[in-house]
Amino acid sequence: MPSLDYSQVTITALIASLAIGYLLGSIPFGLLLTRMAGLGDVRNIGSGNIGATNVLRTGNKKLAAATLLLDALKATAAALIAQKLFGSDTVHLPGLLGGFAAFIGHLFPVWLGFKGGKGVATYIGTLLGIFPLMVLVFAIVWLSIAFLSRYSSLSALVATLVIPVALWILGQPEAAMITSAMTVITWGKHKANIERLISGTESKIGKKG
């Protein structure tokens, strides 16, 4: 991805990119799918989260997988749409902001009182839209840490740390900065998980409780 030429990006384009991203990102697929499936309000079970992990607590694996996919793709769509409308071969800021805004929309959806998911799926979806190679890097890191630790949350957290570093090494400072911000926010949303990891009470992959 070439360096961004900020002089070619208008304020209107930036605002529109953010708006498109936020609106797409704020679609609560986890909540919508569980309601349509007759499983009630997913916010009333488990962690109260609208993401795929909490949807899985309903016992419906297919619905959880669908939630994961849709939460990722809404961020990908936001990045691609913003880039197509306002970006160019040398100007990628609209796409980057579209994906970032979708990530924020998922975490803080206005329709649900700004209480959304934890952002891992939309983080991955944003990567798919702005730098697809990083999805492979994320997957490799996640699988490696999961194999060693059996902690899903730890795997995701470590992967989000690696991505900005990898982008910086590859000469993508703008994408590195945006994903760094996303990483900080993701860690903040996983505060409870981090506390459980430290205390040794975090649930491991394949184990209940």
UniProtKB/Swiss-Prot annotation:
InterPro entries in UniProt: G3P_acylTferase_PlsY
Transmembrane segments: 13-33, 63-83, 94-114, 127-147, 151-171
UniProt topology in membrane: Multi-pass membrane protein
Family to which this protein belongs: Belongs to the PlsY family.
Pathway field: Lipid metabolism; phospholipid metabolism
NCBIfam families noted in UniProt: glycerol-3-phosphate 1-O-acyltransferase PlsY (TIGR00023)
Molecular function terms from GO: acyl-phosphate glycerol-3-phosphate acyltransferase activity
A single GO cellular-component term on record: plasma membrane
A Gene Ontology biological process term: phospholipid biosynthetic process
The protein's assembly and partners: Probably interacts with PlsX.
Top-level taxonomic group: Bacteria
Summary of the function given for this chain in its UniProt record: Catalyzes the transfer of an acyl group from acyl-phosphate (acyl-PO(4)) to glycerol-3-phosphate (G3P) to form lysophosphatidic acid (LPA). This enzyme utilizes acyl-phosphate as fatty acyl donor, but not acyl-CoA or acyl-ACP.
EC assignment: 2.3.1.275
Keywords noted in UniProt: Cell inner membrane, Cell membrane, Lipid biosynthesis, Lipid metabolism, Membrane, Phospholipid biosynthesis, Phospholipid metabolism, Transferase, Transmembrane, Transmembrane helix
Localization in the cell: Cell inner membrane
Swiss-Prot/TrEMBL catalytic activity: an acyl phosphate + sn-glycerol 3-phosphate = a 1-acyl-sn-glycero-3-phosphate + phosphate
Short name of one Pfam family: G3P_acyltransf
Main location: membrane
Protein name per its UniProtKB record: Glycerol-3-phosphate acyltransferase
